Amino acid sequence: MVQTKRQKAIDIAVVPGKAYGIDEAIKILKTATKAKFIESVDVAIRLGVDVKKSDQQVRGSTLLPAGTGRDVRVAVFVPSGAKAEDALAAGADAVGMDDLAEKMQAGDLNYDVVIATPDAMRVVGKLGTLLGPRGLMPNPKVGTVSQNPGEAVKNAKSGQVRYRADKAGIIHCVIGKVNFDDEALKLNLQALLVDLIKIKPTASKGTYLQKVSLSSTMGPGVMIDQSTLSLK
């Protein structure tokens, strides 16, 4: 296959195994963008944890200061009343209880986030086989089971991301779009890493943030030199 001059420049720019300063890494990502759509910027973070052990599982959420650039659809399970009205006022795309559950069972699952109040979990629990495999099951650890659904909806719409270390101990997360300002992407990444440090399992030994890599949807992965980040 014949490489374009641009692709050759990208291949030369990204040296395997080399850690790049955050500013240079972001510039490389933007140079490597080749899709006709606005690509997302993703981060992969290898953690020094053994997820096979229950006391070393990492799961949480972070409200990115510059958002994700995505239009997030949110469904909320909440009894009718003031809290339901708060959720709607915050921008929820669907609010309900048994009626909402019936719609989901009928195939209406076009949501990115599902939120529930604690007293609504009796209804949500029946949807485990539908929501669980899609990563939509509400969970208090990531802020999707909340006594304040209005605030939870606002956070979800404003750029809250949820994450969980996979079997290899790696966190995968979206931190924005390639058309974001460089500083916005940097701030989003730092906010995520700071929150991950806060929830470091006490049983985790050695280096916790072992490797941080950025990539665009269709671009190469770029390893980040963590010393160029502000993680305090």
Swiss-Prot record:
Keywords for this protein: Repressor, Ribonucleoprotein, Ribosomal protein, RNA-binding, rRNA-binding, Translation regulation, tRNA-binding
Record InterPro entries: Ribosom_uL1_bac-type (IPR005878), Ribosomal_uL1 (IPR002143), Ribosomal_uL1-like (IPR023674), Ribosomal_uL1/biogenesis (IPR028364), Ribosomal_uL1_3-a/b-sand (IPR016095), Ribosomal_uL1_CS (IPR023673)
SS bond list: none
UniProt keyword tRNA-binding present: yes
GO molecular function: rRNA binding; structural constituent of ribosome; tRNA binding
Gene Ontology cellular component terms for the protein in this record: cytosolic large ribosomal subunit
GO annotation terms (biological process): regulation of translation; translation
Assembly and oligomerization: Part of the 50S ribosomal subunit.
Family: Belongs to the universal ribosomal protein uL1 family.
Function: Binds directly to 23S rRNA. The L1 stalk is quite mobile in the ribosome, and is involved in E site tRNA release. Protein L1 is also a translational repressor protein, it controls the translation of the L11 operon by binding to its mRNA.
HAMAP family attached to this UniProt entry: Ribosomal_uL1_B
Protein's name in the database: Large ribosomal subunit protein uL1
Annotated source species: Xylella fastidiosa (strain Temecula1 / ATCC 700964)
Source lineage: Bacteria, Pseudomonadati, Pseudomonadota, Gammaproteobacteria, Lysobacterales
Gene that encodes the chain: rplA
